[in-house]
Amino acid sequence: MSTLPVSSASFSSSSLLPVNDKSSKKQDVARNTTTFDASIWGDQFLTYDEKEDFVVEKQLVEELKVEVRKELMIKDYEPTQYGKLIKVVDAIQRLGIAYHFEMEIEEALQHIYTTYGNNWINSKNLESSSLWFRLLRQQGFNVSSEIFKNHMDKQGKFKETLCNDVKGLLALYEAAYMRVEGEHILDEAIEFTKTHLAIVAKDLSCDSLSRTEIQQALKQPLRKRLARLEAVHYIPLYQQQPTHNEVLLKLAKLDFNILQSMHKKELSQIYKWWKDLDLQKNLPYVRDRLVEGYFWILAIYFEPEHSRTRIFLIKTCMWLVVLDDTFDNYGTYEELEIFTQAVQRWSISCLDTLPEYMKLIYKQQVNDHQEMEEALEKEGKAYQIYYAKEMAKKYVRSLLVEAKWLKEGYMPTLEEYMSNAVVTVGQALMIARSYVGRDEMVTEDTFKWVATDPPIVKASCLIFRLMDDITSHEEEQKRNHIPSCVECYIKETGASEEEACEFFSKQVEDAWKVINQESLRPTHVPFPLLMPPINFARICDVLYIDNDGYTHAGAHMINHIKSLLVHPMV
């Protein structure tokens, strides 16, 4: 149903209630269950070394930040040096330290946009114009892709002579992923650069640094990368560049390790909460995937100021895991109906109406929300929990729809399936909750905006749902599960499985175009509030880049987690 952390699993079509459920004494109830492996992490993250206070390092970071701010002072650059300035901005962003300099970066790029509009000073240089285009589009400035006509022939094709400009090709490739619907010049740019970069990547005469960057880009363009993982990837590459800025490099390494320590401490705190619930004993059918869940949340917010929101999000994430496994993997339809009704009422008085094993789920759900509501009430923000609850109610209702389809053996139309499945993926719910407990930028209008299913939220949800279904539909059909979008499409059109997956992969790319369009100014909400739906879409490209990274947490997923939460940057 929804897309939530899993690891490898074994399937059993009819199991019995766990022995700790009192109702099992009355009768044996056949259940459609999946047995999941234990967490591969054990108690590795349960304790945190309090000695890691980084007092000296934090002071050094503050000193280095002063030096970097000088590098970003737009007034200190002649117009002919703006090409150098945008390279500094690009390095800062890719090194993962841009959150320290948001105001300075905005001021610099705003000045460049105001001064030049669509006419970049160095438009004849493919690398420079591509970098200019990408950085301004990322910042929400709607610069025109017509600038790339400078590099096309009379037939409207990119000049073959560009093949000799490897840096320019790579920069154009990355820029083209900022495309919106109807930008055929950027569609053409992706096809052109992909073809030629693939050749370069196999050319042993090309330097290893360039080959590494190209291979990474072809696997995952910058637009779809997560900031923290990009920092892990880029810091060593940047260090190898002969012209690297030593101040930026030193700051990036120090900052990475300070953040990693903070995240480990946070994970240790949430780990204690998770262990106290003792779900392995009380709800043994539930996946134990706290670390994977926290990795997911770090993809949305990694900055220190979002700690409270992160903790609320990880609790939400794990609550969704429990709900997903209960609806997908354990509860009878009658029990799920009762639970759904209780969620709609959202009152602790509903406990007595629930089956014994559901009481822990419901009580914890109510308590976690009440705890956050009480904290927010002191700040005049209790309304945020109202909206969080309403979206949770919608989510649970949609889970029940799928449970009903499964019970009745109903094959939904593709339209029916998708309208419900973009809710059960849980993405919109998580996006809304990413605003809970944030700074004053968030207002009640922010939650009203999310509740209308705006295009950027719809697109983010669609990406998650489609990428999940494409990678996991075969395995899900081996057990008792509702059809995915792939099966629905095949039934309606007579297409092959390969054709169905190609169709939905194209829809994923189209959804990214919507995200890019909705990120251009003027935006419906402040620009920083668009980052959660963008980052939730990006996490899909990490989870599903090779296969279902949650269902089968392979080496790449384990390495990602270790790189962020175990291994320091040296």
PLM regions: where:
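Terpene synthase/cyclase
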Residues: 1-570
